[in-house]
């Protein structure tokens, strides 16, 4: 009888976790963070600048519209789990720029200047 109760409890807990699930779009993902907003870009990156100069280590991208965004290069202010993700975002933006892939939407933290990219959605 105790095994049945444990099984039912485990099943209920597991299904509640599965119901939450992963975000299905950049909009859902962005809504999980504070101080963020979605920018609809639908354009290629016009310029890509990478700086490794001291305290200004970052990647800056600009679009035809003049919109400018950044990705910080991982530093001492980031925990180890953030560093790989930031490096991947930087690499993704470099490849996106070089292949002239269109960026559909960006989720950005709007409490930094320029706005710092949290997530990216691309299209072919």
UniProtKB/Swiss-Prot annotation:
<dbReference type="InterPro" id="IPR008992">
    <property type="entry name" value="Enterotoxin"/>
</dbReference>
<keyword id="KW-0843">Virulence</keyword>
<dbReference type="GO" id="GO:0090729">
    <property type="term" value="F:toxin activity"/>
</dbReference>
<dbReference type="GO" id="GO:0005576">
    <property type="term" value="C:extracellular region"/>
</dbReference>
<comment type="subunit">
    <text>Heterohexamer of one A chain and of five B chains.</text>
</comment>
<protein>
    <recommendedName>
        <fullName>Heat-labile enterotoxin B chain</fullName>
    </recommendedName>
</protein>
<dbReference type="Pfam" id="PF01376">
    <property type="entry name" value="Enterotoxin_b"/>
</dbReference>
<keyword id="KW-0732">Signal</keyword>
<keyword id="KW-0260">Enterotoxin</keyword>
<keyword id="KW-0614">Plasmid</keyword>
<comment type="function">
    <text>The biological activity of the toxin is produced by the A chain, which activates intracellular adenyl cyclase.</text>
</comment>
<dbReference type="InterPro" id="IPR001835">
    <property type="entry name" value="Enterotoxin_B"/>
</dbReference>
<feature type="disulfide bond">
    <location>
        <begin position="30"/>
        <end position="107"/>
    </location>
</feature>
<keyword id="KW-1015">Disulfide bond</keyword>
<feature type="signal peptide">
    <location>
        <begin position="1"/>
        <end position="21"/>
    </location>
</feature>
<keyword id="KW-0800">Toxin</keyword>
């Amino acid at each position: 009888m105790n095994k049945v109760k444990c099984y039912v409890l485990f099943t209920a807990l597991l299904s509640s976790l599965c119901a939450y699930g992963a975000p299905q779009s950049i909009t859902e993902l962005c809504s999980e963070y504070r101080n963020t907003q979605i920018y609809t870009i639908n354009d290629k990156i016009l310029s890509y600048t990478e700086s490794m100069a001291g305290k200004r280590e970052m990647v800056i991208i600009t679009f035809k519209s003049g919109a400018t965004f950044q990705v910080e290069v991982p530093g001492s202010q980031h925990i180890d789990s953030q560093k790989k993700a930031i490096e991947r975002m930087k690499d993704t933006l470099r490849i996106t720029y070089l292949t002239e892939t269109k960026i559909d939407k960006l989720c950005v933290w709007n409490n930094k200047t320029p706005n710092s990219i949290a997530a990216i959605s691309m299209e072919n």
